[in-house]
Design a protein with these regions (language model features):
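Transmembrane alpha-helices and adjacent helix-loop boundaries
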Residues: 1-327
Length: 327
């Protein structure tokens, strides 16, 4: 048994050593455009880890992770917009003047603070996920009904954000590529390399965290919920609490992924809450392998890279491939 443990440990060490070597070599080998794409796809891998946690280990198929992904993106974009608005009239982002707004909305104010922004990026999605999850789980809603409710919530948030032109620029979204951070343009090659490194580190930390969650007693309870929730409830456990916690964790991971994706893509908009995108997130995990964690990471990166390459050669072709993958 000890020998098997040692072999598994060495396999993981070799695996991550190869990944680190690739991550180090990527900025020197890949053009800036391709490096930026890889950084975006790695940020999506963090979202995929959260989905694997709730679906692969707990049996909760959420079709609404785009809500939490977008919230993280909006948090990052709001800070960057404010950080670059010192020369604007009244010190507010330029888009407000298009709608006759001359005073910063109250909920924007805290995002002047970078520490608050970093906390809000994961805490706000986590709290919202906990609230929505608790309302659903305490009524013992599960299976396909849970999936339908998460998609319904996604549509509500999508339509709400689309209509808020005076608050968050509505369908146009918030741009980040022309904003500044640390005295440099966020969209510059230097900053994009920096974001790539940050994303690589956070993917690894997210994997470590989720692996720690599923390898302990907490993870055993999650698997028991997936396999036989009524029996677990009969033994005295409260599945509602565990499902709420794990759904909140997945929401927080989606928020972090959304923030990283936003600073590398240059914009956040309500389209992040579009139904097809949230369904696509599930495909990443399904292709990579439910309950594997590493498979979720590779699934997100490989599927999105394939989408990019196919779309460049045949713009409409990916829709057919995606449909086949979903089936």
């Amino acid at each position: 048994m000890f020998q098997a443990f040692q072999q598994q440990r060495w396999r993981w060490l070799v695996f991550w050593a190869v990944i680190v070597a690739v991550a180090i070599a990527a900025p020197a080998v890949l053009p800036v455009f391709r490096l930026n794409l890889l950084g975006r796809f790695l940020s999506l891998a963090i979202v995929a880890l959260g989905i694997d946690l709730i679906w692969g280990f707990t049996g909760l198929l959420s079709l609404g992770q785009g809500i939490f992904f977008a919230l993280g993106g909006y948090g990052a974009a709001m800070y960057l917009q404010l950080n670059s608005s010192s020369g604007q009239p009244n010190g507010i982002p330029e888009f407000f003047s298009l709608y006759g707004v001359d005073r910063l909305p109250f909920f924007w104010e805290p995002f002047h603070n970078p520490l608050f922004t970093l906390i809000a990026i994961w805490l706000v999605p986590s709290l919202l996920a906990a609230l929505l999850g608790n309302m659903v789980f305490r009524n013992r809603i599960k299976g396909v009904y849970f999936s339908i409710l998460t998609q319904a919530a996604l549509l509500v948030f999508f339509n709400f954000f689309n209509g808020q032109q005076k608050l968050i620029n509505g369908t146009n979204g918030l741009k980040t590529d022309v904003t500044q951070l640390f005295g440099q343009m966020v969209g510059s090659p230097e900053m994009q390399r920096y974001f790539f490194w940050v994303t690589c580190v956070l993917v690894f930390l997210a994997w470590l965290f989720v692996r720690w969650v599923v390898k302990g007693r907490f993870g055993d309870v999650l698997i028991a919920i997936r396999d036989d929730e009524p029996r677990l409830r009969f033994t005295g456990f409260n599945p509602t609490l565990f499902k709420t916690i794990v759904f909140a964790i997945a929401g927080g991971l989606a928020g972090i992924g959304g923030a990283l994706f936003t600073v590398q893509s240059g914009i956040v908009s309500p389209q992040y809450m579009a139904v097809p995108f949230s369904i696509e997130m599930v495909i990443w995990v399904a292709v990579g392998g439910r309950g594997t964690l590493v498979g979720a990471i590779f699934g997100a990166v490989v599927i999105m890279y394939a989408k990019s390459l196919v779309s460049e050669a045949w713009p409409q072709g990916w829709l057919f491939i995606q449909g086949g993958l979903f089936i």
